[in-house]
């Protein structure tokens, strides 16, 4: 079967037994270029005003924010999902002059309450906390527990911007402020599930936008949303979030390889059609192998997606625009061209009044990514009718998959059942067009194209003749100029000699300059070496000085501690001395009191001695001045003259005086000792 993609964007089935013979006689160079060209190229564009050279254009919104490039691998290792993905797209659009004709919007951060419409609170908090976990090791630990995820300090902000930007564009399109839009965002989102990040995806951007329109903006009257996912990988996260929701029709065409292609398992199988109210509203078209191209995708569009979309009648279309099915993608292994993407998008724009929002998902070949994105934006702008041609067949596995999907879903979508007979077209290439008239019309179209090209060639011939006349006139001018040149040859010869001498002088000057430069470099090297030595010496001196100061400080601290210890000893000794002084004062006071008591007793004894017998009277002054050692014993004669009874009182008095005197002497010595000790201490 031969699939021909014509300017009308229709998929036409051509009988290879007839048309190949004709088409091979006509070189494809006679057909228009497959890439879309802008009618306004070379004309001045008004930036973001939606008008080109006075012609009204669709209002196309573009979101790009360089902040999303901060999301990168923490160790600088190159990954396929890299910041250059969105940079390449933006540069491609700028070079083509497309950004000036669109409404350029900055990024917008998503609100937590909108994210929690499809994600759990725990997951939202985890992504938010990534930026606060300052150590990469902690982020790496979190990433290691997830599937195909890397994180750095900018990941959280980029994820919030990606989700919020898709919400922003979708809201403006639903409001009618924009006709359509393309959110050039990263990280992608269709793998992210309600409670888990995976497959490069942190938040499910498209799912957040769809839930926002349905639940947060009922005033926009968006009741049915079609989510188309043409990324080469199955959008497992989006499928699970709307598994039971009949308001959202999810259509995903992807590589499945019987469950062995990422994200693996049976989630992407065509039997996964939804559950409960959402049964029949989840459509998976799983490729059995790689190598699928434009013909395969457009066959799916014509035989499954377009009929179902006509029945569903969406109010808005959200497109998970992954370009990893493009030619040369390192992960996809398929070969969709920019032309193929543009035709698929053009067909979708026939629904929902053209209200369609593209959100970037995958795509890891930078060249294919840029070209495919540009082709899609040009379709959004409705630059020009799509031109192109491709002589390719859908794979046999594509026919099997389309038939299996239609049989599985025909109970939910009558249009698939009603057109089952047309499925035979996939088996019989000439079923749609088996008449000679159709072939003749095609040949006539090709002839008209060739006639137009012949007209262009004739115009070129006329231009060449005019240029030949100009060349003849120029030749005459050149001959006149040649004569002038010959006249100046002599002057030039002299100048050559002078130039040679100047060149020689210049060479000598250059050699001298090189020599001087070499000497300067040597001087700089020596100066640098001297500088390094000086700095080393200074640093050594500073270090030694610091060490000496530290040693001196230690000595001072030791001395200070020693002085503090001595001071403590002095204070202790002073306390002891004060205590001893107090004790001595107490003893002195006691001795004085004792002396006073003794003196009182002596006075009493003296008074008794004066009145005892009345025979002798001794004055107090005599007693105080008397030295008992000078008392001589009574003379024998005196003893003989007195009776023993008369003598007895005198003897008693003498003994008492001797005893009191000795006691007084002892007390005085004690008082003197106390006084001397006190004087010594003071």
UniProtKB/Swiss-Prot annotation:
It is found in: Nucleus; Cytoplasm. Residues 59-382 are annotated as: Histone deacetylase. It catalyses: N(6)-acetyl-L-lysyl-[histone] + H2O = L-lysyl-[histone] + acetate. Gene3D superfamilies: Histone deacetylase domain. InterPro entries: HDAC_PDAC (IPR050284), His_deacetylse (IPR000286), His_deacetylse_dom (IPR023801), His_deacetylse_dom_sf (IPR037138), Ureohydrolase_dom_sf (IPR023696). The record marks 364 as: Polarizes the scissile carbonyl of the substrate. GO terms for biological process: chromatin remodeling; regulation of epidermal cell differentiation; root epidermal cell differentiation. It is an enzyme of class 3 (hydrolase). Pfam families: Hist_deacetyl. Zn(2+) binds at residues 231, 233, 324. Residues 430-608 form a coiled coil. HDA5, a tandem duplication of HDA18, is not required for the cellular patterning in the root epidermis. Responsible for the deacetylation of lysine residues on the N-terminal part of the core histones (H2A, H2B, H3 and H4). Histone deacetylation gives a tag for epigenetic repression and plays an important role in transcriptional regulation, cell cycle progression and developmental events. Histone deacetylases act via the formation of large multiprotein complexes. Required for appropriate cellular patterning in the root epidermis. Involved in the differentiation of hair and non-hair cells in the root epidermis. Is not directly involved in the regulation of the expression of pattern genes. This is Histone deacetylase 18. It comes from Arabidopsis thaliana.
């Amino acid at each position: 079967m031969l699939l021909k993609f014509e300017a009308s964007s229709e998929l036409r089935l051509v009988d290879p037994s007839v048309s190949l013979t004709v088409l091979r006689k006509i070189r494809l160079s006679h057909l228009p270029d497959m890439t879309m060209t802008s009618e306004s190229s070379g004309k001045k564009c008004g930036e973001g005003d939606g008008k080109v050279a006075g012609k009204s254009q669709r209002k196309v919104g573009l979101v790009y924010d360089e902040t999303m490039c901060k999301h990168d691998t923490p160790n600088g290792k190159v990954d396929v999902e890299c910041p250059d993905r969105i940079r390449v797209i933006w540069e491609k659009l700028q070079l083509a002059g497309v950004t000036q004709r669109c409404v350029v919007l900055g990024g917008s951060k998503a609100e937590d309450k909108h994210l929690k419409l499809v994600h759990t609170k725990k997951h939202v908090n985890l992504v938010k906390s990534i930026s606060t976990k300052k150590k990469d090791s902690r982020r790496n630990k979190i990433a290691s527990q997830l599937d195909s995820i890397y994180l750095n300090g900018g990941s959280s902000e980029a994820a919030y911007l990606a989700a919020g930007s898709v919400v922003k564009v979708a809201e403006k399109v639903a409001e009618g402020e924009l006709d359509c839009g393309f959110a050039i965002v990263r990280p992608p989102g269709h793998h992210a599930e309600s409670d888990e990040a995976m497959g490069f995806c942190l938040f499910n951007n498209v799912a957040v936008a769809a839930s926002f329109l349905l639940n947060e903006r009922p005033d926009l009257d968006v009741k049915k949303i079609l989510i188309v996912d043409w990324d080469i990988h199955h959008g497992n996260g989006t499928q699970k979030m709307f598994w039971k929701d009949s308001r959202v029709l999810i259509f995903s065409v992807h590589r499945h390889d019987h469950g062995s292609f990422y994200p693996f398992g049976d989630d992407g199988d065509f039997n996964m059609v939804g559950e409960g109210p959402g049964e029949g509203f989840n459509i998976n078209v799983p490729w059995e192998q790689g190598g699928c191209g434009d013909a395969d995708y457009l066959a799916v569009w014509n035989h499954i997606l377009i009929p179902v979309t006509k029945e569903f009648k969406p109010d808005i279309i959200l497109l998970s625009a992954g370009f990893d099915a493009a030619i040369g993608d390192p992960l996809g292994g398929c070969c969709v061209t920019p032309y193929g993407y543009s035709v698929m998008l053009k067909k979708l724009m026939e629904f929902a009044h053209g209200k369609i929002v593209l959100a970037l998902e995958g795509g890891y070949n930078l060249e294919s990514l840029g070209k495919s994105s540009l082709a899609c934006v040009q379709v959004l702008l409705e630059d020009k009718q799509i031109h192109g041609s491709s002589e390719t067949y859908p794979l046999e596995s594509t026919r099997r998959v389309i038939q299996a999907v239609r049989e599985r879903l025909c109970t939910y979508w009558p249009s698939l059942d009603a057109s089952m007979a047309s499925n035979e077209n996939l088996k019989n290439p000439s079923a749609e067009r088996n008449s000679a008239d159709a072939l003749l019309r095609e040949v006539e179209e090709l002839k008209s194209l060739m006639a137009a090209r012949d007209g262009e060639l004739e115009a070129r011939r006329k231009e060449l003749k005019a240029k030949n006349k100009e060349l003849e006139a120029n030749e005459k001018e050149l001959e006149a100029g040649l004569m002038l040149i010959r006249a100046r040859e002599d002057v030039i010869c002299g100048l050559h000699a002078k130039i040679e001498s100047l060149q020689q002088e210049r060479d000598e000057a250059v050699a001298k300059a090189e020599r001087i430069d070499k000497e300067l470099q040597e001087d700089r090297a020596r100066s640098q070496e001297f500088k390094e030595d000086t700095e080393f010496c200074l640093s050594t001196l500073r270090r030694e000085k610091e060490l000496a100061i530290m040693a001196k400080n230690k000595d001072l601290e030791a001395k200070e501690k020693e002085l503090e210890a001595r001071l403590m000893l002095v204070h202790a000794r002073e306390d002891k001395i004060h205590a001893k002084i107090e004790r001595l004062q107490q003893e002195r006071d006691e001795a004085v009191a004792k002396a006073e008591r003794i003196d009182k007793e002596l006075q009493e004894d003296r008074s008794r001695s004066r009145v005892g017998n009345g025979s002798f009277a001794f004055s107090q002054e005599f007693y105080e001045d008397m030295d008992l050692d000078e008392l001589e014993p009574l003379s024998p004669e005196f003893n003989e003259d007195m009776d023993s009874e008369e003598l007895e009182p005198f003897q008693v008095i003498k003994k008492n005086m001797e005893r009191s005197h000795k006691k007084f002497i002892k007390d005085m010595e004690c008082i003197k000792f106390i006084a001397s000790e006190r004087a010594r201490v003071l």
